[in-house]
C-alpha cells in the first residue's frame, strides 16, 4: 500500500521558519498577513492557509528509525558546522562489507593513512604524541601539495571507539580543517561517513577561484580512498 514518507514530528510553518532562522543565525522574515493572501489569491488562499497534518504511521509501525526525530536536529546537522561564511563542507559516504571492529581499527591507525593517500602527495607519517591514538593525541605528517612541501599536525578529538573520531588541523596549510570520521553498522557491513569542514587561507581574496582548485584536490584524495576501500576483500 501507500506509505507517507514524512516527518514523525510535523510542525507548522511558523515554527519551521523560527527553527530555520535560528539555525541560519538570521532574523525571521515576518509572515504575510492572511488578509493579504486572500486578496491576492481569492479562493485559492484556502489551499495555502489550511493545515494538513500527515503522519508516517505505516513506517513507524514497522520500527523504521529516523535519522532525525525533530526538525531542530535536522537543521543543526545541515547548518551548525558553519562558523564562518568562508567555511566549506565536503561529505562522502561509502559502504563496506568488513566488520565494524576491523574497519575502525584500520582507520584509527595513522600508519594506514599512507595507503589511503594518493602517491602524488608524497604523504609520510612522522610520529604521534601518544603510544596509541586516543582523545588528545597529536599526529605529525609531511606531504607535498601541488609539489610544495608542507608539514601538518592533527589533534584527535571526539574519540568514541567504534563510532567516530575527528582529526583537527592545528598546524598546516589550511586556515581550518576539521575531518570527522563516522562508522555505523548497516546491512551486514559498515557505512563510512566523512565530513570535512575546511577554510582556505586568504579566503577573502579570490576565495572562490582558490576553492575550485582545492576542492578538486580534495575530491581526488577521497576518490582514491574510495577505490582503495572498494578493493577490500
Report the location of each language-model feature.
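Mid/C-terminal beta-alpha module of Rossmann-like enzyme folds, strongest
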Residues: 1-43
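Conserved C-terminal active-site "lid" loop/helix of NAD(P)H-dependent oxidoreductases
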Residues: 14-18, 40-65
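Short linear elements at protein peripheries
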Residues: 53-72, 142, 227-233
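Hydrophobic ligand-binding cavity/cleft-lining segments
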Residues: 54, 58, 72, 76-130, ...
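Beta-strand elements of well-folded, non-transmembrane domains
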Residues: 96-98, 143-147, 158, 185, ...
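Glycine-rich portal/gate segments that line the openings of hydrophobic small-molecule binding cavities
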Residues: 114, 124-173, 191, 224-232
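Beta-strand/loop substructures that line and gate deep hydrophobic ligand-binding cavities in soluble
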Residues: 166-220
